[in-house]
Amino acid sequence: MQKKLYHFLIIYDKIKKGKTKEKSSNNQGRKKEKMKNKVASFIITIVMLLIIIVLGLFILFVWQEIFGGDDENIQVENYVTTYNPTSEKSVEDSEKMTTPQIIKDKINQIINNSQTKTEEKETYNYAEVQVDKYFYNQLNDYSKIIYKAFEKNKEEMKTGTAQIELGDVFTDVLKTEGGDQKLEEYYQSAVETYLYDNPDVFYISASKLYLNIETTTKRKNKTYDVFINSGEKPNYFTDEFTTESQVKQTISQLEKIRSVINSQKSNNPYYDIKMVHDYLIDNIDYDTTLAKKNIYDIYGALVQKSCVCEGYAKAFKYLIDQMEIPCVMVIGQATNTNGQTENHAWNYVQIENNWYAIDCTWDDPVVIGNGKVGNDVRYRYFLRGSSTMSKDHVTSAQFTDGGETYEYPTLNVSDYR
């Protein structure tokens, strides 16, 4: 009996110890679960805080983009060209002939807060504008963009006030060191090239054209908007014109003259070139006073029939271009029969795949008294080769000091026929 009781107590004690161990194990499990829950709650809290911070920053960014912020400013810098063309036929009238030059002129530097400018900059693409002209083809890609912008806006520029938009196409240039100076050079080249390639744009004064660089700064990020206008001037017309109607009326007069001459066009380029040459020297008087302002363009040459060498050369190109005969204007220096050197302008024209020089100005000398000019003088510089022209004509590779360097067509060595 005692032996059975002893076995019972041993069994009971084992059961009791087992339950104690089980209870202790359960307590440890609950503690671990609580710890896991605390860690999970902490992680969730951190994640929520990060989400709130990111969301807040995003909302702040959107708000600044829409409504702007105090850290944005807009700065406009203007660059102006000067155009002071003078040419001469004799040393007594001699003045230096120049073409557009850039002068950095911060006449209107403006800084505004971002609330005045919120719209996005527009990109203007002039790639579709097709140009194939002699001096244009020598420009770099950036100058060609500005040239094409002029060509695209040619009709609008007859108003004298149209703004030529270039958008942000020069941002990569302006972000580089000295970028504004580079853009000035591109602009310089484009303006002078456009005026020499297109004598029909006689009503535009380069000295009244302003290149504007608008810089917008947002939190260290700069964007650039470039455009061309008349600055603070009422228009960019030459002094002869003040209204669009005056310009269009003059264009109409010029087109009538050109139409009459073109109606006499033959199938022989030689006779067509000779016809234009003869028309100019028969109808234009060389202006020895240099008092008129339009003596340097086709308006003075063909409408008022009085000009200097630059007017002769531009008028010749204007008429020959209509006949689709390749022609360029040339500037340089020439030495007259008295041995005096002067600034001068003339033309090169292509016939039968060769280039020849024509100097209408010196084929139309000023006659004192009732004397007459014989053919030996009248055609002295008509379709001449380099062997003749090099004796008294020297070309200039630059239209302006420090401007683009150009190459002229290579003249045939001998005269035509």
Predicted feature descriptions by range:
Residues 242-301:
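Secondary-structure boundary elements
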Residues 311-388:
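Hydrophobic/aromatic-rich core segments of domains that either
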Residues 183, 272, 308, 312, ...:
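Hydrophobic (often cysteine-bearing) scaffold residues that line and stabilize catalytic clefts
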Residues 6, 10-14, 19, 26:
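Short, positively charged and aromatic/hydrophobic N-terminal segments
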Residues 287-295, 299, 306, 327-338:
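Catalytic cysteine-centered active-site loop
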Residues 24-36:
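Juxtamembrane low-complexity tails/linkers enriched in Ser/Thr-Pro and polybasic
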